[in-house]
């Protein structure tokens, strides 16, 4: 592998930090607000890289991928990375529209370069388009099944390319750097990011109409007045206090075994009504009197037994029992 010149070293010093920012965006380790200063710095660095690449004439329009030196292959990713950085730059809706347009231009330029180098052979959708409006209005609508199939195929291809990239990197770490393996790694990365750009361009096309509508409403608020809030009449609930057993039973129910079904008064009125004549009459007064006399006799016997027990305790003190062999 040939040694790097001073110009290539300065290129690499600007390119590598920007590539690190792209890796952090892909990994999702940092939040988007934390990455904003680094994204802006990465855009500035890659713009300088673009100027240096043009001054050094690393690429020409009449060559194929086999003619590009191995050391120059990574810089084919510069427009792709610029598109990713502009896409992730946080701005107001009006400025975001411009950032997405720049991102779209960079990503298309990246795919155009790969097609000119014959690295990809598929026909690009925008080759026959003249303006962005024509792209948004006259773009043929694909069926849902077709969109799903294309997404699955692209995702599968990305996974295969990512696995191939990891495999080549392990080979480069295990042995000394071989130019053939290094070139294969760069080609694999270019193919991976080409699939990624297809996905991001579709996402940008879906987002642009929404941002245009938001920007138009922000610039002409009187044309799009905000709809009045929907007023829904809600019936007012009157406060109430449970003061009677009937209301309490309506709330708590009657089936819980620990709560009585009715009060004594309710049971009495339900059973006998308000007529005292319906109350149960004693059918055997004589029996009641006999029971009372028996209770009195029992009380007299119990009283006499208690008196006899007291007299016994007076005559027989505690511990006076059998004193045999007690000294």
Swiss-Prot record:
InterPro entries (alphabetical): TAP42/TAP46-like_sf, TAP46-like
Q: Indicate, by first and last residue, each region the UniProt record lists as having compositional bias (Polar residues).
A: 275-284
What keywords were assigned to this record? Coiled coil, Meiosis
Ranges of compositional bias, category Acidic residues: 291-301
Instruction: Enumerate the GO terms in the molecular function aspect.
Output: protein phosphatase 2A binding; protein phosphatase regulator activity
Q: GO CC terms on record?
A: cytosol
The knockout note for this entry states: RNAi-mediated knockdown causes 94 percent embryonic lethality when injected compared to 20 percent when fed. Partially rescues embryonic lethality in gain of function mei-1 (ct46) mutant background.
GO terms (BP aspect): embryo development ending in birth or egg hatching; meiotic cell cycle; protein localization to basolateral plasma membrane; regulation of dephosphorylation; regulation of signal transduction
tRNA processing in keyword set: no
Residue ranges for the region (Disordered) are 271-327
Coiled-coil annotation reads: 141-185
Q: Give the superkingdom in one word.
A: Eukaryota
Biased composition (Basic and acidic residues) is annotated at: 302-318
Q: What does this protein do?
A: Probable regulatory subunit of serine/threonine-protein phosphatase PP4 which may play a role in meiosis and embryonic mitosis. Probably in association with catalytic subunit pph-4.1, regulates microtubule severing during oocyte meiosis II by dephosphorylating and likely activating mei-1, a component of the katanin microtubule severing complex.
Q: How does it assemble?
A: Serine/threonine-protein phosphatase 4 (PP4) occurs in different assemblies of the catalytic and one or more regulatory subunits. The catalytic subunit is likely to be pph-4.1.
- This one is known as Serine/threonine-protein phosphatase 4 regulatory subunit ppfr-4
- Source species of the chain: Caenorhabditis elegans
């Amino acid at each position: 592998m040939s040694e790097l010149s001073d110009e290539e070293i300065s290129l690499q010093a600007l390119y590598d930090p920007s590539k690190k920012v792209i890796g952090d965006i892909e990994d999702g380790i940092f939040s988007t607000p934390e990455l904003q200063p680094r994204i802006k710095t990465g855009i500035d660095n890659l713009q300088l890289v673009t100027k240096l690449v043009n001054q050094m004439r690393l690429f020409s329009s009449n060559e194929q991928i086999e003619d590009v030196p191995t050391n120059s292959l990574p810089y084919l990713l510069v427009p792709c990375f610029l598109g990713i950085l502009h896409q992730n730059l946080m701005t107001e809706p009006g400025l975001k529209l411009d950032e997405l347009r720049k991102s779209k231009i960079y990503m298309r330029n990246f795919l155009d370069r790969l097609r000119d180098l014959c690295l990809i052979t598929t026909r690009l959708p925008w080759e026959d388009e003249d303006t962005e409006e024509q792209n948004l209005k006259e773009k043929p609508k694909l069926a849902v099944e077709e969109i799903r199939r294309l997404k699955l195929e692209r995702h599968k291809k990305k996974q295969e390319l990512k696995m191939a990239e990891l495999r080549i990197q392990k080979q480069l770490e295990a042995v000394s750097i071989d130019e053939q393996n290094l070139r294969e790694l760069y080609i694999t990365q270019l193919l991976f990011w080409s699939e990624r750009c297809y996905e991001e361009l579709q996402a940008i096309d879906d987002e642009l109409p929404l941002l245009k509508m938001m920007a138009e409403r922000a610039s002409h608020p009187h044309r799009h007045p905000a709809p009045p809030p929907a007023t829904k009449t809600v019936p007012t609930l009157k406060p109430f206090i449970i003061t009677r057993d009937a209301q309490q039973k309506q709330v708590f129910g009657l089936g819980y075994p620990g709560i009585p079904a009715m009060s004594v008064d309710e049971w009495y009125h339900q059973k006998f009504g308000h007529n005292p004549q319906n109350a149960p009459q004693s059918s055997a007064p004589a029996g009641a009197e006999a029971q009372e006399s028996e209770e009195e006799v029992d009380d007299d016997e119990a009283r006499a037994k208690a008196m006899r027990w007291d007299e016994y305790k007076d005559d027989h003190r505690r511990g006076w029992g059998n004193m045999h062999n007690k000294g």
